Amino acid sequence: AAVPSGASTGIYEALELRAVEHINKTIAPALVSKLAMQEFMILPVGASSFRIGAEVYHNLKDATNVGDEGGFAPNILENKEALELLKAGYTDQVVIGMDVAASEFYRFTASAGIQVVGDDLTVTNPKRAASEKSCNCLLLKVNQIGSVTESLQACKLAQSNGWGVMVSHRSGETEDTFIADLVVGLCTGQIKTGAPCRSERYNQILRIEEELGSKSFRNPLAK
């Protein structure tokens, strides 16, 4: 099972961090990427299987480095350059997602017509996030929110406010496949679980898909 806290922690989470000054002044400058945004992702919203997502992933095979979640980490300097890499010929079937790791990004919700996924705030205080209309989709991390029961409650709260729900893994956790079963059980239609080479959850979803047959596919983002 996954540990209570992963490698990615946010501003609304208790955290003990030793040698803070050394990390901030010596280690961080040597390791931190030049990109302003934390992650660039693909969402194969027009797909009926994982094939399209996998093909976009393999289209980036010339990128050099791989992160702990299986994603490519090429040496690029600008956000635009990262976006230009996400091409595999599926212009109408794949949309781009970005983890901006920002605490104040909700102003885009009303004007841009995009899905804004809340992370730390929705975990610690989903009622506040809903009342402030800070986002329109919940990123559901079971090992961050605390329990399966609390996860179900958060999902219901999000859906009652007209939000989407994206079930997510967490950096640094185990290969446990439970969230694959959870996302199918909740019928949210969205899962964030790293690149295809981290295949445990994808394989579990494929097994569930095979068992459910024609009743398996659900696309909440389809217009």
From Swiss-Prot:
Mg(2+) 2 binds at D99, D119. It holds the Pfam family Enolase_C. It comes from the Eukaryota. It catalyses: (2R)-2-phosphoglycerate = phosphoenolpyruvate + H2O. The modification N6-malonyllysine is found at K87, K215. Its EC number is 4.2.1.11. Mg(2+) 1 binds at S8. The active site is at E69, K141. One of its GO terms (biological process) is canonical glycolysis. Residues 202-223 are annotated as: Required for interaction with PLG. ISGylated. Lysine 2-hydroxyisobutyrylation (Khib) by p300/EP300 activates the phosphopyruvate hydratase activity. Its main location: cytoplasm. Its cofactor is Mg(2+). Keywords: Acetylation, Cell membrane, Cytoplasm, Glycolysis, Lyase, Magnesium, Membrane, Metal-binding, Phosphoprotein, Plasminogen activation, Repressor, Transcription, Transcription regulation, Ubl conjugation. It is found in: Cytoplasm; Cell membrane. Pathway: Carbohydrate degradation; glycolysis; pyruvate from D-glyceraldehyde 3-phosphate: step 4/5. One of its GO terms (molecular function) is magnesium ion binding. Binds two Mg(2+) per subunit. Required for catalysis and for stabilizing the dimer. The modification Phosphotyrosine is found at Y12. The modification N6-acetyllysine is found at K25, K61, K87, K133, K141, K215. Belongs to the enolase family. Glycolytic enzyme the catalyzes the conversion of 2-phosphoglycerate to phosphoenolpyruvate. In addition to glycolysis, involved in various processes such as growth control, hypoxia tolerance and allergic responses. May also function in the intravascular and pericellular fibrinolytic system due to its ability to serve as a receptor and activator of plasminogen on the cell surface of several cell-types such as leukocytes and neurons. Stimulates immunoglobulin production. Mammalian enolase is composed of 3 isozyme subunits, alpha, beta and gamma, which can form homodimers or heterodimers which are cell-type and development-specific. ENO1 interacts with PLG in the neuronal plasma membrane and promotes its activation. The C-terminal lysine is required for this binding. Interacts with ENO4 and PGAM2. Interacts with CMTM6. This is Alpha-enolase. The lineage of its organism: Eukaryota, Metazoa, Chordata, Craniata, Vertebrata. The gene is ENO1.
